[in-house]
Amino acid sequence: MALLMRLLTLALALSVGPAGTLAGPAKSPYQLVLQHSRLRGRQHGPNVCAVQKVIGTNKKYFTNCKQWYQRKICGKSTVISYECCPGYEKVPGEKGCPAALPLSNLYETMGVVGSTTTQLYTDRTEKLRPEMEGPGSFTIFAPSNEAWSSLPAEVLDSLVSNVNIELLNALRYHMVDRRVLTDELKHGMTLTSMYQNSNIQIHHYPNGIVTVNCARLLKADHHATNGVVHLIDKVISTITNNIQQIIEIEDTFETLRAAVAASGLNTVLEGDGQFTLLAPTNEAFEKIPAETLNRILGDPEALRDLLNNHILKSAMCAEAIVAGMSMETLGGTTLEVGCSGDKLTINGKAVISNKDILATNGVIHFIDELLIPDSAKTLLELAGESDVSTAIDILKQAGLDTHLSGKEQLTFLAPLNSVFKDGVPRIDAQMKTLLLNHMVKEQLASKYLYSGQTLDTLGGKKLRVFVYRNSLCIENSCIAAHDKRGRFGTLFTMDRMLTPPMGTVMDVLKGDNRFSMLVAAIQSAGLMEILNREGVYTVFAPTNEAFQAMPPEELNKLLANAKELTNILKYHIGDEILVSGGIGALVRLKSLQGDKLEVSSKNNVVSVNKEPVAETDIMATNGVVYAINTVLQPPANRPQERGDELADSALEIFKQASAYSRAAQRSVRLAPVYQRLLERMKH
């Protein structure tokens, strides 16, 4: 009962917020960032918030955890200052900001938050100031003084030339006829403004930044007697066109316009939703080689993939980007959208030339470079962007590169450049065949490969797939990087050249003079049939040198005992195919003899039972061969090791028994006696 009461007390404590109130709904991202800023500023007194200012600019941000430690925003260094949190002010002689700001009407509150220019323009109209000072409940997104001063002169002149129509309408568009706080500003919502019920777009991002028509909230939730004031960094204007309509009227989108029409994506860009279009200008298309561009424009599927790669699934305003973030496109790819100073970047490159062109269904950023996805590229183009350029050069020398630029459904198993660090192989008929065996006759995806699968190549070979815990291999070569899936082909980056099998394990051993003594031993033991038939074996093949290193009397004794010879040879044969790329730190491989082999790899050196392997991955149709310069001994043939194991087992038994009785504890003291008896058994 006492335990139950403690649990109930804990549950009640967790469900109750500050001052005994029930815990409320989850805080919005903005409120969470503000809370973090409060925590960082509390050492300076009550209601103090830490603020990060970007050095060399007037930009300030409430600090989140990541920015606090990095001290950077958009790659620029920041300095920390401490200010009164929204709604509070200092009191002379007291620490922090202990006093709540006295409530005034909307008009007066705009002056408090630093929007005196908005006050000035409000005074110029006949109707607006009385509304702001009178009864009612309103929200105003008040532009900062800097926002007004940054307006183009012709825009400002048109507003002030007709204050009771143009200026009044512009100011009313910044107002909503009810109180709206940041916790109500949901991502992707629209608010109805007081100018002809025109919509205002709201975006509330996970990093705590809130935008209104892509203008950032600088100071939020300043209460007034008749509403609330949010200070924003831009003067906002009405949005009338959708994305497709903007494409239609912009001269710089002539090529994009034609491409969208040909792809049928115009229905998407004029429909409902909130998208970001990274809109390539005419100049962006002109940078692409004519052959490549014509190929894509003439291929409906590639064209659609190209355009989908320029459409983000959500609206992303420039002011919301303070660091790199991955964003998904309509095509399912991801782009890294970031910033460097005042410039927006895509995949680390500053390609955005004009930003935040607002549409009713999203936002447009002009880009001066085409973002071609892998799915619209040929295999040759994919390879040109990967660390396999040497393999491509070899293909070109062999006259085989046309396979990678056409419409053949292929998967190219391309060795890394590092594979050729010792030189490029000579191009002859045999090398051409080997290169063709690096081209699989279908477009694959590595995530669908499975162990035991066979792949047909242009060179006429069947390649086997081996799946291990931490690697995926095709014959002796393992995939070293993520697939690149192109329009018709897929690029697999491989860690070595393939060596397709040329015969059975027995064929391999017979064809290599190093193994002549092993072949004779296999024949003597009657194991030829096993190594000639279909199967999956890993053979650690002792070389002639290994047999010659044995004491003559021991070797003669072994060869004279057919049963013992068979036992030892079977211990050298694993019951599955294990290529070196699948080994990892340690693999215990069961042998045909029954005991397990310990195979390990460290610093590119493969060992079996701690003995280094002389040569790895000699592929056969029914297995793989490793050359070793030692004859391995099964555990039963290692008396010292066997005795140690028995001794360890005896000690363990007595240790376990000691946990249960005093008699068992006395038995543990007898363990050294048993140890000595076992030592005698070994001799």
Curated annotation (Swiss-Prot):
Distribution of this protein across tissues and organs: Expressed in heart, kidney, liver, skeletal muscle, testis, thyroid and uterus.
GO terms assigned for molecular function: collagen binding; extracellular matrix binding; identical protein binding
GO biological process: angiogenesis; cell adhesion; chondrocyte differentiation; extracellular matrix organization
Positions of modified residues (S-cysteinyl cysteine): 65
Compartment(s): Secreted; Secreted, Extracellular space, Extracellular matrix
SMART domains, alphabetized: FAS1
All copies of domain EMI, residue ranges: 45-99
Motif Cell attachment site: where in chain: 642-644
Keywords in alphabetical order: Cell adhesion, Disulfide bond, Extracellular matrix, Gamma-carboxyglutamic acid, Phosphoprotein, Repeat, Secreted, Signal
Signal peptide: 1-23
Cysteine disulfide partners in this protein: 49-85, 74-339, 84-97, 214-317, 473-478
GO CC term (a single one): extracellular matrix
Residues with PTM Phosphoserine: 37
Modification note: Gamma-carboxylation is controversial. Gamma-carboxyglutamated; gamma-carboxyglutamate residues are formed by vitamin K dependent carboxylation; this may be required for calcium binding. According to a more recent report, does not contain vitamin K-dependent gamma-carboxyglutamate residues. The EMI domain contains 2 expected intradomain disulfide bridges (Cys-49-Cys85 and Cys-84-Cys-97) and one unusual interdomain disulfide bridge to the second FAS1 domain (Cys-74-Cys-339). This arrangement violates the predicted disulfide bridge pattern of an EMI domain.
Residue span(s) of domain FAS1: 103-236, 240-371, 375-498, 502-632
Domain of life from the UniProt record: Eukaryota
Entries under Pfam families matching the protein: Fasciclin (PF02469)
UniProt subunit comment: Binds to type I, II, and IV collagens.
Role description: Plays a role in cell adhesion. May play a role in cell-collagen interactions.
The protein, known as: Transforming growth factor-beta-induced protein ig-h3
Organism: Mus musculus
Gene name tied to this protein: Tgfbi
